[in-house]
């Protein structure tokens, strides 16, 4: 008699999607503010053990893939630098230190309610809201700092966690270092600086070539003089 073993159904691994197919931002102003802030923070934190992620799923409960949120910009310290498809707290061992939401009237309730409560429970040290269209926030840029288990408003616009002074410039968040007051350039300004430095280098090389050419021409003239009149006294 042949005894058949019961069929064992394979256990499917839990999937943690990296995207829901929704647009990154609802308007150009929101997208631009996110992209600029993301790039400036990445440049600022280059060389440090940190990563800056934008509009990517943050999973905060292992085994529960629906327990997720997608901050517009988040900064995480004490993790490997570089991008990720998504961020799982239990794998990385660190919660985001700072989160930015580029808010609007349509996301107002979620940003000031559910997300603020969630980020406080997670232990996110600073939570910043920026309203590029100035639709609903009394202050267009408002930060909150975690004290105990609740957030308190940041009055002076200073991110102590990042070491930066935050302000508004033409629908974008501008950043200045707290230690020396240096302004972090916007990507367009950084590109202009690179172009100016490149042009200055080209100008210096051209001037050097012209000087060498003039020297060679002078030596030719002097040699002709010597050939005709002899050495100069």
Q: What residue ranges belong to the model's regions?
A:
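Gly/Pro/Ser/Thr-rich low-complexity, intrinsically disordered segments predominantly at protein N-termini
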Residues: 1-233
